[in-house]
Amino acid sequence: MAVSLPLVFTAPRRGMPPKHLADLDSTERREAVKELGLPGFRADQLARQYYARLEADPEKMTDLPAAVREQVGAALFPTLLTAVKHLACDGGDTRKTLWKANDGTLLESVLMRYPDRATLCISSQAGCGMACPFCATGQGGLQRNLSTAEIVDQVRAAAAALRDGDVHGGPGRLSNVVFMGMGEPLANYKRVVAAVRRITSPAPDGLGLSQRSVTVSTVGLAPAIRKLADEDLSVTLAVSLHTPDDELRDTLVPVNNRWSVAEVLDAARYYADKSGRRVSIEYALIRDVNDQPWRADMLGKKLRKALGPLVHVNLIPLNPTPGSEWDASPKPVEKEFVRRVLAQGVSCTVRDTRGQEIAAACGQLAAEN
């Protein structure tokens, strides 16, 4: 088993990146523009360039006077993320991007194209403090929180790449965003919620994706799940449960020592009731660890009792990580697990695994240069 790491809820005190337009709400944008000595209407103009035209370089904003572009760039459009490299697999349909922030911090995002949609998996932190032993990100520890703009800019860059046909499959449109990359989103709560609002608000306030096409994942920070429910968003909540019993979950998902399975499912039910959305339960199936028939039965019973019809189980065949002695359950075991969960009246499917050979799959992101 991997070395046990401490839980880290508060990010190390490292300098955050300079303010960016995407950090600001509409009122703050207008104030920032006026501080530059520009008329107020420029605020919406700049926001439309960024959110609607997906343009992050003021030098290319032709409706902005050339004389002020450099000033605007320095004040509102600092370069936050630089692509270090792209890796592709699955016939080019999966592309992982390694980003370097302006302080040298590394993070990753993964773009996945399907026949009917394009999904971007984004990071909310550099590293992760939740210390799950089967996850490469968790084993690397937490470096720092990402800013709202660093989160949003991952999405803008992917949307622009799809629009411009820079990825395999020709021009397309970004349809889904999942906060399932590096980090525990609810441990960077304020910035993640602000990013969700930027991603889903229509221009000039955001990128205009449907809230229902955005998924926010968590290992189970129960109070933060309840807080998210009270934001009155309709994003999908995904809970990384991985086992239905506290004894094993205390090890697999160390945050369980703080909030038990029952507390997490109770918070998830509150979210489902408030949002009207079905909660997704993520379950990485690990050979001889959490794949026993009795655990499938227990999972189905607990979920049916806690969430009724407002739940769906995503089984994830464990993706290999360096140094781990664990591997995925055999297909017959996986099939029987699904059958048993379904027999309890709970929806359950096996997730299509993408990006394994480029370490872009669930639990593999380690931001290695």
Swiss-Prot record:
One of its GO terms (cellular component) is cytoplasm. Residues 114-351 form the Radical SAM core domain. The active site is at residues 108, 362. Pfam families: Radical_SAM. Keywords: 4Fe-4S, Cytoplasm, Disulfide bond, Iron, Iron-sulfur, Metal-binding, Methyltransferase, rRNA processing, S-adenosyl-L-methionine, Transferase, tRNA processing. Binds 1 [4Fe-4S] cluster. The cluster is coordinated with 3 cysteines and an exchangeable S-adenosyl-L-methionine. Its cofactor is [4Fe-4S] cluster. Reaction proceeds by a ping-pong mechanism involving intermediate methylation of a conserved cysteine residue. This is Probable dual-specificity RNA methyltransferase RlmN. The gene is rlmN.
